[in-house]
């Protein structure tokens, strides 16, 4: 993984906008988020404002996925879905930090949340109370596992969740 100076050069306009402390730091993002960054750059070029705006759109998509998944996960765990939504998604700290700071964690957590919802639905569909066709159960489980894997491809810490999916 390369840092801004080694990847772009010390005089590149984007490198000049990186604080000195981070200029030689290697990139810690996974291949999926690097692909997102590459697509943003392909669309916006050296236009910092447009690139920042597009990265924020990606962060908002992650927050929207999180907003869809958190109440469902909370309900499954016997926690108030409204409280979970306010504390986990809609509070100013989450919105300010993840969207304003254009952090990859918004996309990472959104993919993780939706993936876990799909995996849990597959497990619920296997139960005797609500038997579903095996193809549906398998499709939900595989889709969930793929989304959790994509989350880990944004940033590696969520690979731990894939272990729990495998144990499910």
Where are these regions (language model features)?
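Membrane-interface transmembrane helices that cradle and orient dolichyl/undecaprenyl
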Residues: 78, 105, 112-140
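Transmembrane-helix signature of polytopic, membrane-embedded enzymes
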Residues: 70-92, 123-130
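Membrane-interface alpha helices of multi-pass inner-membrane proteins
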Residues: 95-97, 118, 134-166
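Membrane-water interface at transmembrane helix exits
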Residues: 37, 41, 45, 71-75, ...
């Amino acid at each position: 993984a390369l840092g801004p100076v080694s990847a772009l050069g010390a005089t590149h306009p984007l490198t000049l906008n990186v604080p000195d402390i981070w200029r030689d730091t290697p990139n810690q993002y996974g291949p999926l988020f690097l692909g997102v960054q590459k697509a943003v750059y392909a669309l916006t070029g050296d236009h910092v404002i447009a690139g920042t705006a597009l990265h924020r759109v990606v962060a908002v998509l992650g927050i929207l996925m999180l907003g869809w998944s958190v109440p469902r996960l909370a309900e499954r765990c016997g926690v108030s879905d409204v409280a979970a939504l306010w504390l986990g998604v809609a509070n100013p700290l989450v919105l300010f930090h993840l969207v304003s700071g254009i952090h990859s964690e918004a996309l990472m957590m959104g993919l993780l949340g939706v993936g876990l919802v799909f995996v849990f639905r597959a497990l619920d569909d296997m139960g005797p109370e609500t038997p579903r066709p095996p193809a549906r159960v398998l499709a939900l489980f595989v889709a969930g596992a793929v989304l959790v894997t994509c989350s880990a491809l944004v940033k590696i810490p969520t690979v731990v969740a894939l272990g729990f999916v495998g144990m499910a």
